[in-house]
Regions:
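Short cysteine clusters
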Residues: 96
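Active-site pocket-lining segments that scaffold enzyme catalytic pockets across diverse folds
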Residues: 76-77, 81-82, 90-93
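C-terminal, well-structured catalytic/ligand-binding subdomain of enzymes
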Residues: 1-70, 78, 88, 101-108, ...
Length: 347
C-alpha cells in the first residue's frame, strides 16, 4: 500500500500525482462502452459544477501524463457505479463491511475493504492537506476518489457498493467522490447529511457518516431517493451502525437490482451486529476481533472467488488515531498511522 502525502492547490496536487504516474510508467488502458462513456462525460460535468476542486485535480493529472481529460474523467466517474457492465448487468466487484460505534465517551469506526487481489498492490493511504479544505486521510484502491477516510475534525465518511439497476443509473457523483467531498468539506454528521441530500448521486450506494460526538448514520442512496438509517443501542448504552453491500431498508427495496447475498453481505452484517450488541469495553481489540473473523465470517473468502480483504482499518474519531492492516487482518498486524494526528496538531 502506497502512503502518499499531497499538499497545496488542486493544480499542485494533480501535478504531483501525474508525476508519480510518469515515474512509475503507469499505463491507463481505459476501455469504456458507449453507456459508460456517455454517463462518465455527463457526470464529469456535474463534478466540475459541484466539486470543482476534484475536477481541477484530475485536469492537472491528465495534463501532466498527456492523457485526454474527458475520457480519463469519465473512467473515474464510472468507479463505484458502473465500471464493468456485462450482459446488461453491473458487474463491478466490491464487497465491504463498515461500521461505526461508541464505547463510553469515544467514537470509533472500522472496515474491511474487500476487492479483487490485483488491486492490493496499487492501493493507497493518502494524507491530503489541500489549501481550500480540511486535512484528511483517504484510503483508496484508486486515487483522487476513495472508499473511506477521516478528517482533522474527526469526521469519518465511507461507502459500500450496492448493485444498481442499470435503468436507474444517472449522471451524478459516484460513491467514491461523495466520500472525498465529505472529508474535504464537512465537520459534522449533520453537515454531511445536508451535503448528501443536496448532491446528485449516480447510483445505488451506502454512505456511512460519523463524527466524534457519536452522531452516526448510513444514508442509502439512489438517484431518485435517499433514506437515512440511524444507529442501534446495545444494553451497555453503546451506539452502533453497520453497512454492507445491500440497501437494507424496506423503503429502498424498490431500487435493489439483486435480492441475493452479495459476497456474503448477510453473514458479514450478522457477524458485526452480534458482536456490537455485546460490546461493553476494549473498543480497539473488539473491532480487531470482528474484522479478523474471530466473531464469525467477515473476510475468509474461498480462493476460487478471486476476492479478498486488501486492507482493514480502525479509526478513533475522538483522538484521530488510525490503525490499518495492509492485507487480510486475520493474517496481518494493524499498524498505527499518525500522519493525520501529527499534521492536525501542528496547525
Amino acid at each position: 500500500m502506497y502512503h502518499w502525502r499531497l499538499k497545496g492547490s488542486p493544480y499542485q496536487i494533480g501535478t504531483k500525482i501525474g508525476n508519480i504516474f510518469k515515474r512509475c510508467n503507469a499505463e491507463f488502458p481505459i476501455v469504456l462502452d458507449d453507456f459508460q462513456l456517455n454517463y462518465g462525460i455527463e457526470s464529469g460535468k456535474l463534478l466540475k459544477q459541484h466539486f470543482p476542486v476534484a475536477y481541477e485535480e484530475v485536469k492537472a493529472i491528465t495534463y501532466t501524463i498527456g492523457y485526454p481529460n474527458e475520457r480519463f474523467l469519465a473512467w473515474l466517474m464510472c468507479m463505484g457505479c458502473c465500471l464493468d457492465i456485462d450482459e446488461n448487468k453491473c458487474a463491478e466487484v466490491r464487497g465491504c463491511t463498515a461500521f461505526a460505534f461508541t464505547c463510553g465517551e469515544e467514537t470509533y469506526y472500522a472496515r474491511t475493504n474487500d476487492l479483487p487481489p490485483f488491486l492490493k498492490k496499487i492501493s493507497k493511504s493518502i494524507l491530503y492537506q489541500p489549501d481550500r479544505g480540511y486535512k484528511f486521510i483517504l484510503n483508496t484502491s484508486s486515487f483522487t476518489n476513495g472508499e473511506e477516510g477521516i478528517n482533522e475534525h474527526g469526521l469519518v465518511a465511507a461507502m459500500t457498493f450496492a448493485i444498481p439497476k442499470i435503468t436507474e443509473i444517472k449522471a451524478g457523483l459516484n460513491s467514491v467522490f461523495l466520500v472525498r467531498y465529505l472529508l474535504e468539506k464537512c465537520k459534522t454528521t449533520k453537515e454531511g447529511i445536508a451535503t448528501i441530500q443536496s448532491l446528485p448521486v449516480s447510483s445505488n450506494c451506502n454512505i456511512l457518516i460519523a463524527d466524534k460526538s457519536g452522531d452516526m448514520v448510513v444514508i442509502e442512496c439512489n438517484p431518485y431517493q435517499k433514506y437515512i438509517r440511524y444507529p442501534m443501542v446495545n444494553e451497555y448504552g453503546n451506539k452502533f451502525i453497520i453497512t454492507v453491500n445491500d440497501l437494507l431498508s424496506s423503503e429502498m427495496a424498490i431500487h435493489k437490482a439483486s435480492q441475493g447475498d452479495t459476497f456474503f453481505s448477510k453473514e458479514r452484517y450478522a457477524t458485526a451486529e452480534n458482536a456490537l450488541l455485546k460490546l461493553k469495553d476494549n473498543p480497539i481489540d473488539s473491532a480487531k476481533a470482528i474484522l479478523s473473523d474471530k466473531c464469525g465470517f467477515m473476510c475468509q473468502y474461498a480462493k476460487q472467488l478471486n476476492f479478498e480483504t486488501i486492507w482493514a482499518t480502525i479509526f478513533n474519531l475522538s483522538d484521530l488515531s488510525v490503525y490499518r492492516a495492509e492485507g487480510n487482518p486475520s493474517k496481518c498486524s494493524f499498524i498505527n498511522d499518525s500522519r493525520l494526528k501529527i499534521c492536525s496538531e501542528k496547525s
